[in-house]
Amino acid sequence: MKGVAYLKLIIAEKPSVAKSIASALGASSRADGFYEGSGLLVSWCVGHLVSPMDAGGYDERFKKWRYDDLPILPEPFRYVLAPGKEDAFENLCALMNRPDVDIIVNACDAGREGELIFRLVYEMAGCRKPVLRLWISSMEDSAIREGFSDLRPGADYEALYQSALCRQKADWLVGINATRLFSVLYHRTLNVGRVQTPTLAMLADRDAKITLFHKEKYHLLRLTLDGAEAVSEKFTDPAEAEQASAMCKGSAVTCTSVTKEQKKEQPPKLYDLTTLQREANRLFGYTAKQTLDYAQSLYEKKLLTYPRTDSRYLTSDMAETVSCVIHLTAKLPPFDSCTDFFPLVETMVSDKDVSDHHAIIPTMEIEKADIKGLPLGERNLFLLVCCKLLCASAEPYVYETVTATFDCCGHSFTAKGKRVISEGWREIDRIFRAFLKEKPADGDGDTLPDFTGGQTFDGAEVVVTEHFTQPPKPYTEDTLLSAMENAGKDGIPDEAERKGLGTPATRAVIIEKLVAAGFVERRGKSLIPTKAGINLVTVLPEPLTSPMLTAEWEQELTEIAKGSTDPDTFMDGIRTMVQEIVSTYSCISEDGKKLFAPEKKVIGTCPRCGQPVYEGKNNFACSDRSCGFVLWKNDRFWTSRKKELTKKMAADLLKKGRTNVKGMWSEKKQATYDAAVILNDTGGRYINFKLEFPKRKVGADGRK
């Protein structure tokens, strides 16, 4: 239109990000649902505004869960507005369709889910205006401005969008069909997920190994020489250990060899999200979700770079900026007590190992940030990332290992020691752990005396110690995240970009879903599968529990995002698998049905047949269905008196045939009263009750 000043509409994923973008780009005027200024409108989604339609939306009959309606395979998929987010969508829709807006800028999170969030809103709004993509790894003003000066065509991310769609559709197809199928078969809601179920299978497998573990006893001989300790090989027979000890005590000992080897331990890599979550769990006990939430908050506060990354390297164009960040970080307590060092930035740089986002590091904003004012969780995580940056840029840790072997009466003993030559990056790690009051990550070991080959010792001191083999340890979030990341590793080529269950951005959600569904429980730092979780893994088919298969799917999604795999081929494979599972599992055995039956507690004995009576959701019923004896909690007898039959009242009725009830309501008198309720079972379909009122005491005048 002639004379119209056209605007760019920038859409962020959440209000806080939109505010930062608006501030950085000069859109300083706040309106209802957007910021405006400098030729820009800046608005926001509130997470996912558009989501796949529920099964019931495709057909009324799908509102009920029935085996005969499976599988449900919608084509095409339809989408609806997320409940409660209609206003946010209408605001964006109105802005996108404004005649003075000529370009839409997708500024949602720079990743698979961020792409999906924007695209679904764009499609549902019916917008056809050109799209540009803001792709940044930091919320610093300088990074936002630099990213905005280098906007990319939205079409460049079409493959990423297709990958996101395939992920969403696959989760819907597997989740809806498998959950309904096994819930109907086992008469209990059993939530099945494309990624969460194989994760549960790993937990169940570890639990089984712990349960079946048989500990074995063994013994060691410990020889003391000049204050150092040398240890024998294992003895499985205690008699042999005692015999060897008796032979060695007081005997001569000869040093048969001394081996010294200088070793170098390179600095650790920077954090990606998974390694950050793992270490935060080890050091602070934070769950994966807590760590992600803290990291996201620090990102939005401009103190950390983008957290949902799977790279542990930086790009070459960042070298100068990172060097400045390192020097700023080194001034922060407790790192300001470290020995001066010159950062080796080149060790952290690898362009080929950075795809969407580089490793997580602090930003230049730390120079003016109030670190002490951060909430404790965020402060701990921020300092952890700072520590890793300093360690990664420091000198290697250099040490010498010493291994001395000894002979005593034909038995071999070994002593090991270590001597630090240059502490390097471990100095920073040690200082940080001392600040946290944590032990060093790896003890330096004892320094051995200067043993020499051929050296002899008289009067050996020997003791026998008893030990047991140890079972595998339960998974913690640290070790489970590692297992998820490496699942299927052996079956995927080394050059593959992603191996494992889920992505760094989704693994925390998967763990939380398993806990919320009652399939996993937290015991301290350990994640333990519940009985229901173990049973679920037992009854599900291999395609739904195989970490290898699911890891292969995740790899295919990565290939789709790169444009090297056809999305339709992937989805055809998912649909075929769902159809095969539904057709294979049409019924289960009677024993199978009992797997998920709630554990019932006997509250009494049936007065008709003598069998146990159990509490159900709405009643107390005889365990023999043919008997028919049932006490309903909301029988009209009770509801008319504004009461509900409780477990104690039912137990009294079964044991004594009566129960005393206070505060029953009389509609006629509009008042409450107390009475004994008598069980009056005539053997019919319904149980009857009678009331017995307490006898009144006779007064002095003869009246009651």
Regions found by a protein language model. Name each.
Residues Y6-L7, V105-A110, H187-T189, K260-K269, ...:
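Conserved short loop/turn motifs at secondary-structure junctions
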Residues E36-S38, T224-A228, D407-H411, K669:
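Short strand-coil-strand connectors
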Residues A239-Y271, Q277:
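Metal- or metallocofactor-binding catalytic centers and their adjacent structured scaffolds
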Residues F77, P99, D141-L225, K260-K264:
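C-terminal or mid-to-C-terminal helical accessory/interaction module adjacent to the motor/catalytic core
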Residues G3-L9, A31, K85, M96, ...:
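Basic, low-complexity terminal or inter-domain segments flanking catalytic cores
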Residues P15-A22, G39-V42, V46, A82-C93, ...:
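Amphipathic alpha-helical transducer elements in NTP-driven molecular machines
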